[in-house]
Amino acid sequence: MNPTVIDAALARSFGLAAEEYDRVLAIMGRVPTLTELGIFSVMWSEHCSYKSSRIWLKTLPTTAPWVIHGPGENAGVVDIGEGRAAIFKMESHNHPSFIEPYQGAATGVGGILRDVFTMGARPVANLNALRFGDPSLPVTKRVVDGVVRGIGGYGNCVGVPTVGGETNFHPSYNGNPLVNAMTVGIADQDRIFLSAAAGIGNPVVYVGSKTGRDGIHGATMASAEFGADAEEKRPTVQVGDPFIEKLLIEACLELMATDAIVAIQDMGAAGLTSSSVEMAGKGGVGIELDLDSVPQREAGMSAYEMMLSESQERMLIVLKPGREDMARAIFEKWELDFAVIGRITDSGRIVVKHQGRTEADIELAPLADQAPLYERPWVEPAKPAPLGPVESPLPPGAALLALIGCPDLASRAWIWNQYDGTVGGQTLRRPGQADAAIVRIEGSRRALALTTDCTPRYCVADPETGGAQAVVESWRNITATGATPLAVTDNLNFGNPEKPAIMGQIVAAIRGMGEACRALDYPIVSGNVSLYNETEGTAILPTPAIGGLGVIDDGAAATGIALAPGLDLVLIGETSGELGASLFLREILRREDGAPPALDLAAEKRNGDFVRRQIHAGAIAACHDVSDGGLLVALAEMALAGNTGIALAAIPEGIAPHAFWFGEDQARYVAATADGAALIAEAAAAGIPARPLGRSGGDHLTGPDGIAISLSEIRAAHEAFFARWFA
């Protein structure tokens, strides 16, 4: 076999630009080995280095008195009271999920679970944020089916409930679906494990599954656009085993109950390379690996293959000296591989040995903290033209049926029913029951409120407003349950950052997110960036997905959206009828134009704090924020959840019925209460806009402008899309 020629062309095929390869040559002072080039290519990939976004991410607010660990660790950590901490993060598996939908989605779930339990937390909930292409295309149906089965197959088997998420459709995702997975875990605050290696001479231990050839250069693939050859990249998709993951969780948590661990890191993107480099780099030490000791699933694996493999269900641990036998006994009890594969050194370098040869010897700093950092050219996104007058071709009732049955609003029961949302017995509110999932903290009355949110059509119209709106909708959804929002994890999904227009979207969205987080005291504590989400030059809609976490003192008292008969309905917040970039505009008029609804961050905070106070005071029996589709959609969703009709009140003068019912003005909630007049009076005293909307009861939605629809008709429209699609 001829030896591989190491040159700029090979480096380019690995994802390194010409100037980056020149930088490698300068750092090394020689031509790198194949293994060294592979290590540089994955560590300098967009997926691992954040080289295009890092300077902008640093502008985000990340601290608060309740934040224990912010960005920089495997996941964010926040104080949730009673000596406990919530550990959570969201991460993407976009590119693999188009090539191999089932395994791409499944291993996305597995990877984010490991990010959380590697810090000492028992995972208690999974969520997701999914974006798919045009439903009329056969490929979209194939991807949706595979992704949903993959999420359910992995999460159900590993025993962690999938409790919430969101799903949108748009042609921009035709060749590039987004699969963003979020995991939340709970740990004792004094038992949190970090990834910084320490202790010269300490053993470095490999645990979990054996290493195979799956996933090699997965991080590089996730840092490039798709072309017409996407199907040929199937070997770069990892293969997961949720049963092994379950054993790995239990074995790691058992070891964590001892005092044996110095540092621990999962082998995620870039596998053994990223885990070893990050652990040693964070600790300011060196690391030496002997690949002869790595458990291997396939014969004849090279050092290059072992270092870049992304085989799943693997962890790297630095142990205290003398604890190897005790740790080995734990992992062998759980029928997992355990091997001492290296040691910590004082060299500040990563040294990789295999079959008596040194295959890599690289200074760590250029691989991690001193990796390339770019301030790419960008242009400020143009503000959209004003929408102008909009007429409706349909009366409100017919428009409601069309909207509530459209792919973006149709019932997700077909999806939810494939997920086990109650395994573990702590889920108090599932999808469709409340604006956020509610998961009880074991051994406590307290509970977590969890949600994922983003409105991509706002983000493409105005990335700054869209980025901010994703944050505030997350905050509203948590607030509507009565919980206090604490912190955010994000997943920034964009196109090619080398294009100034796309880079401008990234900059503007991050700016908007930061403004909203500061206004709401809602810091970002972890996250992920997924760029190059383009297929043959066409980018996805900018999609800065937000995962929100809050806490409520009594989870059983969390407010849902289901109406009971005999309640007054009150609208909290101002309505002017903003239809720009709305779902009504897209689905009814087939238009995607106009500015998204304006944001008033002070009003968001004021209105939300008022709603939360009233929930705590027992004045609100059900609550729903107003978002996609506007007010009439929110009311219909509440009616369906409680199987109770509504007699709607007259609308205010001076606003068109379709604008009132379907405008997507922000900072609004529908509150159901036993005494509407009293709630409106409380709002007036607090300077909060509020108006009566009607009263619950019966089995129809009735009101002005000819609205008279039975709940059965609304339900049939709402449930038809997925049932028909997958019949």
From Swiss-Prot:
Mg(2+) 2 binds at residues 115, 266. Pathway: Purine metabolism; IMP biosynthesis via de novo pathway; 5-amino-1-(5-phospho-D-ribosyl)imidazole from N(2)-formyl-N(1)-(5-phospho-D-ribosyl)glycinamide: step 1/2. Keywords: ATP-binding, Cytoplasm, Ligase, Magnesium, Metal-binding, Nucleotide-binding, Purine biosynthesis. It catalyses: N(2)-formyl-N(1)-(5-phospho-beta-D-ribosyl)glycinamide + L-glutamine + ATP + H2O = 2-formamido-N(1)-(5-O-phospho-beta-D-ribosyl)acetamidine + L-glutamate + ADP + phosphate + H(+). Pfam families: AIRS (PF00586), AIRS_C (PF02769), FGAR-AT_linker (PF18072). Substrate binds at residues 92-95, 114, 238, 310-312, 530. It is found in: Cytoplasm. ATP binds at residues 50, 89, 490, 527. Its EC number is 6.3.5.3. One of its GO terms (cellular component) is cytoplasm. It is an enzyme of class 6 (ligase). GO terms for biological process: 'de novo' IMP biosynthetic process. The active site is at 47, 93 (proton acceptor). Mg(2+) 1 binds at residues 91, 528. It comes from the Bacteria. GO terms for molecular function: ATP binding; magnesium ion binding; phosphoribosylformylglycinamidine synthase activity. Its main location: cytoplasm. Monomer. Part of the FGAM synthase complex composed of 1 PurL, 1 PurQ and 2 PurS subunits. Belongs to the FGAMS family. This is Phosphoribosylformylglycinamidine synthase subunit PurL. It comes from Acidiphilium cryptum (strain JF-5).
